[in-house]
Amino acid sequence: MNTNEFNTKDLIEMEVNRLSNKYGKDYLDCEDIIKITGLGRNNVRTLMNNPKFPTTIIGRRKVVSLTNFVVWQFNNK
């Protein structure tokens, strides 16, 4: 395999590690997703309320794991 070739699993793992190092978190909230995507707050809230978006409820907050977020991004280009 050429060193420039990566499979999807490797790319997802690298992106999860990059975001984890940048934000110091394993879960993203609305504000984090706004920073990452550049979307507005209302659009991110709509996205987080979409049943197809991989959120988890912790207490009264909706969050998404970094891994699920990155996988979702790759599957929804």
Predicted regions and their residues:
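Basic Lys/Arg-rich amphipathic helical interaction modules
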Residues: 1-46, 66-77
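Short Lys/Arg-enriched helix C-cap and helix-to-coil transition segments
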Residues: 56-63
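Short secondary-structure boundary/hinge segments and terminal tails
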Residues: 52, 65-66
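Structural signal for short hydrophobic segments within the conserved structured cores
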Residues: 26, 54-56
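The DNA-recognition helices of helix-turn-helix-type DNA-binding domains
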Residues: 51-52, 76
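Basic/aromatic recognition patch in beta-strand/loop cores that engages polyanionic ligands
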Residues: 45, 49, 58
